[in-house]
């Protein structure tokens, strides 16, 4: 199944968090925080502005982004955990 978000929504896959600290201590699953960083896997076609014109999104598929701790709605598609959020929930794009 493929998910195509509508309007100004994006689908994000969280990046995997480190299993160990820099000092080599293994972090148990219940002590890990969910990463606030992810990769855009799909984008909507933009919101409709006040002038009834479509406003394109600033992010694109493949962008690595930062978002708020409580941003988005968690969904499971084909066994993969994803987030659906509005573009305004994204704080920034990480440049490579």
UniProtKB/Swiss-Prot annotation:
InterPro entries: Chaperonin_GroES, Chaperonin_GroES_sf, Chaprnonin_Cpn10_CS, GroES-like_sf. Keywords: Chaperone, Cytoplasm. Coiled coil: none annotated. SUPFAM superfamilies: GroES-like. One of its GO terms (molecular function) is metal ion binding. It is found in: Cytoplasm. SMART domains: Cpn10. It comes from the Bacteria. GO terms for cellular component: cytoplasm. Together with the chaperonin GroEL, plays an essential role in assisting protein folding. The GroEL-GroES system forms a nano-cage that allows encapsulation of the non-native substrate proteins and provides a physical environment optimized to promote and accelerate protein folding. GroES binds to the apical surface of the GroEL ring, thereby capping the opening of the GroEL channel. Heptamer of 7 subunits arranged in a ring. Interacts with the chaperonin GroEL. Belongs to the GroES chaperonin family. NCBIfam families: PRK00364.1-2, PRK00364.1-5, PRK00364.2-2, PRK00364.2-4, PRK00364.2-5. This is Co-chaperonin GroES. The gene is groES.
